[in-house]
Regions:
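Serine-hydrolase-like catalytic core of hydrolytic proteins
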Residues: 1-113, 150, 159-186
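Substrate-gating cap/lid region and adjacent catalytic-acid/histidine neighborhood
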Residues: 72, 85-87, 118-208
Length: 208
């Protein structure tokens, strides 16, 4: 989901990023065109995802490019709410735009004068070898869907509020202990003991 001003200028839509979602949409098109050859029904396709996959399913529910490619959806432990989708160009308070993050990423690897051609020359091994870098406070926000006016005209939250969602059966829910491996403090008994009998209210306020 890397966006960058130079990538946007190369696009006839004047946008960049969301390549992961576009790959998912291309895969759904292939399934719809070919599933009958495997005994499936192209008019009864269900998509399902858990955690990041649940977020992907929820985002596909609002993309106009995925309309008609599936008929039912299941999302577990991943809604994409409230601010997973980043605006492509506009910085909003602490939420840095996708293109700004792309520029920071280029500078991180290649210095102040880095351009998109330099980035294309980077070995893949070098990129994946620094999975612990943080250009912003929240690393998760570096690799998520982008409100670009094309793949995603608006955020997931706004799309559901405005009812700009595919009209089809949609099952949502959460699995027990989802995400606790990423946030061990939440399930550490010492954390509960700090708050005494008020731990439910206090912990809820803390994690929010």
């Amino acid at each position: 989901w890397l966006a960058h001003p130079e990538l946007s200028r190369e696009s006839e839509k004047n946008v960049s990023g969301n390549y992961g979602t576009l790959d998912q949409i291309a895969a759904l098109k292939w399934v719809k065109d070919n599933i009958a050859n495997f005994g499936g029904d192209p008019n009864n396709i269900t998509i399902f995802g858990e955690s990041a996959g649940g977020q992907a399913v929820t985002s596909l529910m609002i993309s106009p490019l995925s309309k008609g490619l599936f008929h039912k959806a299941i999302a577990q432990s991943g809604t994409g709410l409230p601010n997973v989708l980043t605006d492509i160009r506009e910085d909003k308070g602490l939420l840095v735009s996708a293109e700004s993050k792309g520029i920071k990423l280029a500078k991180y690897f290649l210095g102040e004068n880095a351009n998109i051609n330099d980035l294309r020359e980077l070995p893949a091994l070098k990129i994946v070898s620094i999975d612990d870098f943080q250009l912003d406070q929240d690393l998760i926000m570096m690799t998520n869907q982008i409100v670009d006016g094309y793949v995603f005209p608006e955020s997931i939250k706004d799309a559901f509020i405005n009812q700009n969602v595919h009209d089809l059966p949609f099952m949502v829910g959460f699995n027990g202990d989802e995400g606790t491996s990423l946030f061990p403090l939440i399930i550490d008994p010492k954390t509960f003991s700090l708050f005494g009998e008020f731990w439910p209210e206090s912990l809820w306020a803390f994690v929010n």
